[in-house]
Amino acid sequence: MDHEADAYRTDLMTITRYVLNEQSRNPEARGDLTILLSHIVLGCKFVASAVNKAGLAKLIGLAGETNVQGEEQKKLDVLSNEVFVKALVSSGRTCVLVSEEDEEATFVDPALRGKYCVCFDPLDGSSNIDCGVSIGTIFGIYMIKDKDNVTLEDVLQPGKNMVAAGYCMYGSSCTLVLSTGNGVNGFTLDPSLGEFILTHPDIKIPKKGKIYSVNEGNAKNWDEPTAKFVEKCKFPKDGSSPKSLRYIGSMVADVHRTLLYGGVFLYPADKKSPNGKLRVLYEVFPMSFLMEQAGGQSFTGKERALDLVPTKIHERSPIFLGSFEDVEEIKGLYAAQAKLEHNH
């Protein structure tokens, strides 16, 4: 084994080391975000282990029936939510939490309060668990001005105010993608070390992609610009090859592929869901933040996604995100439609 390769293999950039490096670039940093992120990472490791069916044997019991004496198995999404809420509260760095699983925001006990708000979906795509499709955790972090008098209003900030965002995908491997506002980096969980190692430094999405990702089962309810765009993907007028369709139906997996390979992911509004289906605070915003940090863009059909100001915590929005030029094309179609309506 040559020495150079060996040196490279033994110099591990863990997520903790990466975040500490980022912190040291900012002279007024107190380490609060670093501590908060390490608690999120712990939550992700726990969920990764649970999703991988750790402890399954105890649950099923030797005879193959479900263990009757033991507690009934908690649904994974409920379990994941509890783990994240407890990890975030105990970090002492949060004052309010918004989870997809909880109808109301959670205000942290004053003694444990810190200056951050975390919005998260503990297990996105959890309806896919049984068929082995990748699922994930999504999170976005905001700063709160006055932690002692925090209100719901403080949570309803536009996405551009986020200080960090990321997702963790539990698939064939466990991958955590993170941005603290200075580019996007991907880390993979090394199960033998229990550490996330930097495997995808400085992710940049291709300027234009060959893939479109959308649930075409909703096509009959789409608006005009969406229908036109998908038509162009399939039957390009300019002689170029048609785009490939890839749709997993788990947002984390679809966005992850879009980020790495380029292309566009869309969940448009339709007649049944006039505001689309994805939630602003913990799906649309974090993914849009990552896309922009990676050189792509994100659009709601009306505006840049990160400029949207939500009015309630579980608000929904249509979303088009991905490669810069592909989203630019969608923006053009919406602009043309608006002009048409204006003239009528």
From Swiss-Prot:
Cofactor descriptive note: Binds 3 Mg(2+) ions per subunit.
Taxonomic superkingdom: Eukaryota
InterPro entries: FBPase_C_dom, FBPase_class-1, FBPase_N, FBPtase, Fructose_bisphosphatase_AS
UniProt: Mg(2+) 1 binding residues: 71, 100
Keyword list, A-Z: Carbohydrate metabolism, Cytoplasm, Hydrolase, Magnesium, Metal-binding
Subcellular location: Cytoplasm
Positions annotated to bind substrate: 124-127, 215, 247, 267, 277
Binding site for Mg(2+) 3: 121, 124, 283
Cofactor(s), by name: Mg(2+)
Record-listed Mg(2+) 2 binding positions: 100, 121, 123
GO annotation, biological process: fructose 1,6-bisphosphate metabolic process; fructose 6-phosphate metabolic process; fructose metabolic process; gluconeogenesis; sucrose biosynthetic process
Keyword Hydrolase: yes
Swiss-Prot/TrEMBL catalytic activity: beta-D-fructose 1,6-bisphosphate + H2O = beta-D-fructose 6-phosphate + phosphate
Gene Ontology molecular function terms on file: fructose 1,6-bisphosphate 1-phosphatase activity; metal ion binding
Record flagged with keyword Cytoplasm: yes
A Pfam family of this chain: FBPase
Gene Ontology CC terms: cytosol
UniProt-listed Enzyme Commission number(s): 3.1.3.11
Recorded family membership: Belongs to the FBPase class 1 family.
Miscellaneous information on this protein: In plants there are two FBPase isozymes: one in the cytosol and the other in the chloroplast.
This protein's name: Fructose-1,6-bisphosphatase, cytosolic
Taxonomic path: Eukaryota, Viridiplantae, Streptophyta, Embryophyta, Tracheophyta
